[in-house]
UniProtKB/Swiss-Prot annotation:
Pathway: Carbohydrate degradation; glycolysis; pyruvate from D-glyceraldehyde 3-phosphate: step 4/5. The gene is eno. This is Enolase. (2R)-2-phosphoglycerate binds at Q167, K341, R370, S371, K392. It comes from Pseudomonas fluorescens (strain Pf0-1). Its main location: cytoplasm.
């Protein structure tokens, strides 16, 4: 088996023009694996730490030279001569070297970039596609599925400079027979939505994740214009296409209340749960992410009891891809799904452990990008290699989003029918 002979870190830019970390892992046979760490805007307070320099004279303090130095110094020294295919040992060694609960010493961005780059190098060394190597690491060799894309076509909240409080309004092509057909459906809806917004005299500028970011009369108005676009594209809402929300409610949780400032409404936890329930009764919304604040577990229990039987309730800021927090949620019957983001936890091994724990408990797992992305498409391979069944990777424009969709098209073609697209059955209800 090949050995690691060099590791290189560098500062590159993400899709928001902010620095992030890229790592190369070089093997003794000349193979190089490269990976970039993404970055979030609406972040959970318990996420692993993204190490930034804080030097206001460079990149407004957002430089990552400290994280890069940790890759080129202590992480490189630690991993030289090790086997890149032993992912668990490699990741655990970095976790031990860091020595903190949230990877604050080395930086989760440094550790993650090396973790993923090593996986890519190991896959190449074994002459395997990355998704196949991930399936092996996951203990499910040769088992794959194509994910249903959750396409974020209207952006609000922290992802846009508009008056829409809810962060993401998504369409899911659940009636498609394949991923490629689903991607086409979503793309057609996206273009019809642009026409609907133009006809209303609304902005068609896009947000961080490529969705349109108009000012709207209410959050529900976003659902109305999307419904119109679905119909104009020739699809049936509720059958061909369903809807999903990412409320990112922690971003508008103030003094124990949920403040939808864009439409001048303030709710208690139970009141906001009822508001969301009402939306699910008026529209075919089958998934809601971060419907309540990450610390409002009592509110989450209310929401789960109200609509959890029929609606996928996804914990993002709530669980932060952390098995300790997820286990607590499972034990308390809070939510029924987890959003999976590599950089919330910081290694591939811990990411796989979170997916496995969720599935064992009957929770779904949704693989996700971050709002600050790069051309790195690893999450596409993760979704297929773990048979997660769902992926969130933004809208149908911006290359940082489309790169993941294009990688999924390549994988589907390569697998040639060996990975099923399960559509509506991936969701509850």
């Amino acid at each position: 088996m090949a050995k690691i002979v060099d590791i290189k870190g560098r500062e590159v830019l993400d899709s928001r023009g902010n620095p992030t970390v890229e790592a190369d892992v070089l093997l003794d046979n000349g193979i190089i694996g490269s990976a970039c760490a993404p970055s979030g805007a609406s972040t959970g307070s318990r996420e692993a730490l993204e190490l930034r320099d804080g030097d206001k004279s460079r990149y407004l303090g957002k430089g990552v030279l400290k994280a890069v130095a940790n890759i080129n110094g202590p992480i490189r020294d630690l991993l030289l001569g090790t086997d890149p295919s032993d992912q668990k040992a490699l990741d655990q060694a970095m976790i031990k070297l860091d020595g903190t609960e949230n990877k604050a010493t080395l930086g989760a961005n440094a550790i993650l970039a090396v973790s993923l780059a090593a996986a890519k190098a190991a896959a190449q060394d074994q002459d395997l596609p990355l998704y196949a190597h991930i399936a092996n690491l996951n203990g499910t060799p040769g088992v794959y599925s194509m994910p249903v894309p959750m396409m974020n076509i209207i952006n609000g909240g922290e992802h846009a400079d508009n008056n829409v409080d809810i962060q993401e309004f998504m369409v899911q092509p659940v009636g498609a027979k394949s991923f490629s057909e689903g991607l086409r459906m979503g793309t057609e809806i996206f273009h019809h939505l642009k026409a609907v917004l133009k006809a209303r005299g609304l902005s068609t500028a896009v947000g961080d994740e490529g969705g349109f970011a108009p000012n709207l009369a209410s959050n529900e108005d976003a659902l109305k214009v999307i419904s119109e676009a679905v119909a104009n594209a020739g699809y049936k809402l509720g059958t061909d296409v369903t809807l999903a929300l990412d409320c990112a409610a922690s971003e508008f949780f103030e003094d124990g209340k949920y403040n939808l400032s864009g439409e001048g409404q303030v709710f208690t936890a139970e009141g906001f749960a009822d508001y969301l329930k009402g939306l699910t009764e008026r529209y075919p919304i089958i998934s809601i992410e971060d419907g309540l604040d990450e610390s409002d577990w009592a509110g989450w229990k209310i929401l789960t009891d109200k609509i959890g039987e029929k609606t996928q309730l996804v914990g993002d800021d709530l669980f932060v891809t952390n098995t300790k927090i997820l286990k607590e949620g499972i034990d308390k019957k809070i939510a029924n799904s987890i959003l999976i983001k590599f950089n919330q936890i910081g290694t591939l091994t811990e990411t796989l452990e979170a997916i496995q724990m969720a599935k064992a408990a009957g929770y779904t797992a949704v693989i996700s990008h971050r709002s600050g992305e790069t051309e790195d498409s690893t999450i596409a391979d993760l979704a297929v290699g773990t048979s997660a069944g769902q992926i969130k990777t933004g809208s149908l424009c911006r290359s940082d989003r489309v790169s993941k969709y294009n990688q999924l098209l390549r994988i589907e073609e390569q697998l040639n029918g060996k990975a099923k697209y399960n559509g509506r059955s991936e969701f509850r209800g």
